[in-house]
Amino acid sequence: MTMPFGYASPEQQVRDKSEYARKGIARGRSVVVLTYENGILFVAENPSATLHKISEIYDRIAFAAVGKYNEFENLRTAGIRLMDSRGYMYDRRDVTSRALANAYAQTLGAIFSESVKPYEVEIVVAEVGTSIADDQIYRLTYDGSIADERGFVAIGGASEQVTTSLKEHHRDGQPLAEALRVAVQALTVGVPPGLPQNGERVLAAANLEVGMLDRTRTRRMFKRIVGPALEGLLAQTSAT
């Protein structure tokens, strides 16, 4: 049977889409999500003060992403609307990170299968529980694949290097300052594309976006750490 000019098998199309999405994600600077004694910490290498990679979704749920900003921003806002409507129609306790992760997985899977161009995004959805054992972290990739992560996860271009550092230094129940030190240290190990591979990088507060889900807070547990509060925590990390 003669194939038409320009024909590509389904397997080749999947490979091409995957390669395209991975290359786009690899250009993004990494994000780290890890547990600490009172919740879940989000740390992104992000020099922009307005284009956020980290966001609150609902009371106990937050979101982090790397890749093409307009694509993950569309997913973020859709997730907020979905969780708000679920909480309004049913009960706030029915709003879970698992439901949000499943919705994102279906959306990303459909886009990957049906569209010529896949989304160039990698996402983390996290929910803080009443204890460390109840914390939930889900990682979602461009094709809708979903993974249940324990303790920590890194996404973005240098995620393999960053993950190696997290495996060595993260432990359950770390104080906030220590968890931030572990996260920043891991991000400095991962070198974004286009930067020299030699020499130790230093990440200051101006180059970091930091937020947390704090189980000791009431109702809305997400909080950004900015300005003097972040600088003070970074000073503690450099002193340890």
UniProtKB/Swiss-Prot annotation:
CDD domains noted in UniProt: proteasome_protease_HslV
GO annotation, biological process: modification-dependent protein catabolic process; proteasomal protein catabolic process
Top-level taxon: Bacteria
Entry's Gene Ontology cellular component terms: cytoplasm; proteasome core complex, alpha-subunit complex
Subcellular location: Cytoplasm
Associated pathway: Protein degradation; proteasomal Pup-dependent pathway
Keywords: Cytoplasm, Proteasome
Main location: cytoplasm
Regulation: The formation of the proteasomal ATPase ARC-20S proteasome complex, likely via the docking of the C-termini of ARC into the intersubunit pockets in the alpha-rings, may trigger opening of the gate for substrate entry. Interconversion between the open-gate and close-gate conformations leads to a dynamic regulation of the 20S proteasome proteolysis activity.
PROSITE patterns registered for this protein in UniProt: PROTEASOME_ALPHA_2 (PS51475)
One term of GO molecular function: threonine-type endopeptidase activity
Coiled-coil stretches: none
Any Pfam family: Proteasome
HAMAP family, per database record: Proteasome_A_B
Biological function: Component of the proteasome core, a large protease complex with broad specificity involved in protein degradation.
UniProt xrefs under PANTHER family: PROTEASOME SUBUNIT ALPHA/BETA
Assembly: The 20S proteasome core is composed of 14 alpha and 14 beta subunits that assemble into four stacked heptameric rings, resulting in a barrel-shaped structure. The two inner rings, each composed of seven catalytic beta subunits, are sandwiched by two outer rings, each composed of seven alpha subunits. The catalytic chamber with the active sites is on the inside of the barrel. Has a gated structure, the ends of the cylinder being occluded by the N-termini of the alpha-subunits. Is capped by the proteasome-associated ATPase, ARC.
Family: Belongs to the peptidase T1A family.
Protein's UniProt name: Proteasome subunit alpha
Lineage of producing organism: Bacteria, Bacillati, Actinomycetota, Actinomycetes, Frankiales
